[in-house]
Amino acid sequence: MKNSFRNFEAYALVTGAASGMGRIYCLRLAERGYNVVLVDINAKGLAETEALIQTEIQASQTIAEDVKKNFKMLSIVQDLSQVDAADQIYAQTEAAGCEVEVLVNNAGVMYCQGIAETSERMLKLIMMVHMNTPLLLCRKYVGAMKDRGCGYILNISSLAAWMSWPGIGMYGNTKRFVRDYSRELRIECQKTGVSITNAYFGAVDTPLIPLRDNLRKLARNLMVMITPEKAVKRALNATFRRRRGTMPGFLNKLFWPFIVMLPDCLLGFAYRKAKPYLMKV
């Protein structure tokens, strides 16, 4: 994509927009000239994100005043674990006349627990939020993108897509599904003007990763954990350059070959040691 300002002529849709990286995606996409569709289950957080974006756009010294008047937002309060979540989101954007040019499937959940110890409710939730709803959102919006000859889809996979480890296995399993269907869809969309990009994040400094402040600071200093701002910047740059994927963080790239080679016996030993400290979900 040319890095030209879009003059608020098209929409970017971001799930998980009420806080964290989702909020940052919305801000950065608005700065690129996109109207924004914000999706989250948290209505209060969506309102806060809307207010923050509106303030930033109106305060911008680089956007002409007459162009600022074109800026629009649509907030959709939606539980992404519901079977009809994608249908509800699509229906509301169609009713509002939103031409979605950028889709960011950002929403996610994370926990550390073995499959047998995880509640059925949580297993269903993580599969719906990471697999079912993002896939169906891709399916619903990609057709119009292809018809227009322009579209960008950013799916959030993970370094964990290569880590079938007990404790984080279900998180990794769902992210592996994201990785693989994104590749298939990218190949299907060749020569159409539509690209699909995967972000393979390792540890990002967000509340999704439960760490004490001292350990969080240590992880940042060791470059094991990156800031959400850096993660979003790398992901969006890769998206608009139509790259297949991006894996921010030098150590992620360094350790990736070793991660996939860890033997089952070592993983089993580590899980047995860690199991007493894992939280029931």
Predicted regions: what is each one?
Residues 106-111:
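Conserved NAD(P)H cofactor-binding loop of Rossmann-fold oxidoreductase domains
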Residues 138, 174:
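Active-site helix of classical SDR
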Residues 158:
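Residue(s) in the substrate-gating loop at a strand-loop-helix junction
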